Amino acid sequence: METFPLLLLSLGLVLAEASESTMKIIKEEFTDEEMQYDMAKSGQEKQTIEILMNPILLVKNTSLSMSKDDMSSTLLTFRSLHYNDPKGNSSGNDKECCNDMTVWRKVSEANGSCKWSNNFIRSSTEVMRRVHRAPSCKFVQNPGISCCESLELENTVCQFTTGKQFPRCQYHSVTSLEKILTVLTGHSLMSWLVCGSKL
């Protein structure tokens, strides 16, 4: 099973134990009509996509002790690189979606070379908002641990196939239904995308 650790705060999925200051930062981040972003032209008409609270991919557990600047940067990074509201993308198939989205969102390595892989979580803002109200995980029996899991979300993984420099990168895609599993233990807030079925 492949998992992607995610920074839960960026999704705005805050469990009851989250501190008041953390809640304040999240409220400040997610106002302004759900963060409407105008995406620049890329040989197509200018589009507007609604981008909500999003996680950033991490490789280790994340503490709640993030500064406001770090959190803002984290939120913006994930919004632009990993979140895709289905209403905002008219592309017909996953391969085109991967190729178009990586150009549109300017997904590349720092040196301008093609990124080996990237994933786009495709979900309506309504589904994302409801995750914190999702049922509790049945396997957690420790009173010090809070856990919940979402409904299934569409996750498209774009795997690099050809090209050298951005924007001439081509990707192969695999889309699967996955659930967001969220866990709060003491001062650590963690979340994972847990693989479900391939589409």
From Swiss-Prot:
- Mind telling me which Gene3D superfamilies this protein's record contains? Ribonuclease A-like domain
Signal peptide as annotated in the record? 1-16
Q: Does the keyword Glycoprotein apply?
A: yes
The primary site where this protein sits is: secreted
Q: Which GO terms describe its molecular function?
A: endonuclease activity; nucleic acid binding
Q: Which GO terms describe its biological process?
A: defense response to Gram-positive bacterium
Which residues of this UniProt protein bind substrate? 115-119
Write down what this protein is called.
Putative inactive ribonuclease 11
Q: Which organism is it from?
A: Homo sapiens (Human)
Instruction: State the organism's lineage.
Output: Eukaryota, Metazoa, Chordata, Craniata, Vertebrata
Q: From the UniProt record, report the name of the gene that encodes this protein.
A: RNASE11
